[in-house]
Amino acid sequence: MYQPDFPTVPFRLGLYPVVDSVAWIERLLEAGVRTIQLRIKDKRDEEVESDVIAAIALGRRYDARLFINDYWRLAIKHRAYGVHLGQEDLETTDLKAIQAAGLRLGVSTHDDMEIDIALAAKPSYIALGHVFPTQTKQMPSAPQGLAQLASHIERLADYPTVAIGGISLERAPAVLATGVGSVAVVSAITQAADWREATAQLLAIAGVGDE
């Protein structure tokens, strides 16, 4: 049963781009995206604070669900919609502080054991990956594939879920057919020949999410 310790999110978050700049946040919100994540890696808080502030302001302007990856202190300070954490971040993050601030929490998982760990934290949603081979980041685990993804979805039942990893425009319908609530994409948009067209097509497939 879906009873998170954090504020709830819709079962369907819709198309969920993960991008590394405020410029991409603005472009995609203007294009109609309503769930998005700012993921800037390996910088100090003070180096990214201005970007976090700008991204959160854009999220508010477009009434969007904007998640900040990793920089949870800044997300709390500037009142983001939510925070997304990797497994390695769970042990070093003050989850109670995120909870007390009223922010949503998403957690990455790669196998059943990590799903168990995520469920223990009772987050707002659980991300499942990587589904297909991906060039976006180095992954220590093997791709799960659609059958394993479907198995995870069946196990998680009514828990909001996000599939991530190597999801292209062509693969998105099959991913959604597993019952997953939403699809996260990176290069399918940022490396597309025409990002506007790619975004429009992905929105037509995955939607903007439930209210």
UniProtKB/Swiss-Prot annotation:
SUPFAM superfamilies reported for this sequence: Thiamin phosphate synthase
Stored CDD domains: TMP_TenI
Task performed by this protein: Condenses 4-methyl-5-(beta-hydroxyethyl)thiazole monophosphate (THZ-P) and 2-methyl-4-amino-5-hydroxymethyl pyrimidine pyrophosphate (HMP-PP) to form thiamine monophosphate (TMP).
Gene Ontology biological process: thiamine biosynthetic process; thiamine diphosphate biosynthetic process
Gene: thiE
Cofactor note: Binds 1 Mg(2+) ion per subunit.
Residue positions binding 4-amino-2-methyl-5-(diphosphooxymethyl)pyrimidine: Q37, L38, R39, I40, K41, N69, S108, K137
GO molecular function, one term: thiamine-phosphate diphosphorylase activity
GO CC, one annotated term: cytoplasm
Name of the featured protein: Thiamine-phosphate synthase
Enzymatic reactions: 2-[(2R,5Z)-2-carboxy-4-methylthiazol-5(2H)-ylidene]ethyl phosphate + 4-amino-2-methyl-5-(diphosphooxymethyl)pyrimidine + 2 H(+) = thiamine phosphate + CO2 + diphosphate; 2-(2-carboxy-4-methylthiazol-5-yl)ethyl phosphate + 4-amino-2-methyl-5-(diphosphooxymethyl)pyrimidine + 2 H(+) = thiamine phosphate + CO2 + diphosphate; 4-methyl-5-(2-phosphooxyethyl)-thiazole + 4-amino-2-methyl-5-(diphosphooxymethyl)pyrimidine + H(+) = thiamine phosphate + diphosphate
NCBIfam families: PRK03512.1, thiE
EC number: 2.5.1.3
Highest taxon of the lineage: Bacteria
Organism ancestry: Bacteria, Pseudomonadati, Pseudomonadota, Gammaproteobacteria, Enterobacterales
Annotated residues for binding of Mg(2+): D70, D89
Keywords recorded for this protein, A-Z: Magnesium, Metal-binding, Thiamine biosynthesis, Transferase
Species the sequence originates in: Salmonella agona (strain SL483)
Family assignment from sequence similarity: Belongs to the thiamine-phosphate synthase family.
Enzyme class: transferase
Family matches, as PANTHER family: THIAMINE-PHOSPHATE PYROPHOSPHORYLASE, THIAMINE-PHOSPHATE SYNTHASE
Metabolic or biological pathway, per its Swiss-Prot or TrEMBL entry: Cofactor biosynthesis; thiamine diphosphate biosynthesis; thiamine phosphate from 4-amino-2-methyl-5-diphosphomethylpyrimidine and 4-methyl-5-(2-phosphoethyl)-thiazole: step 1/1
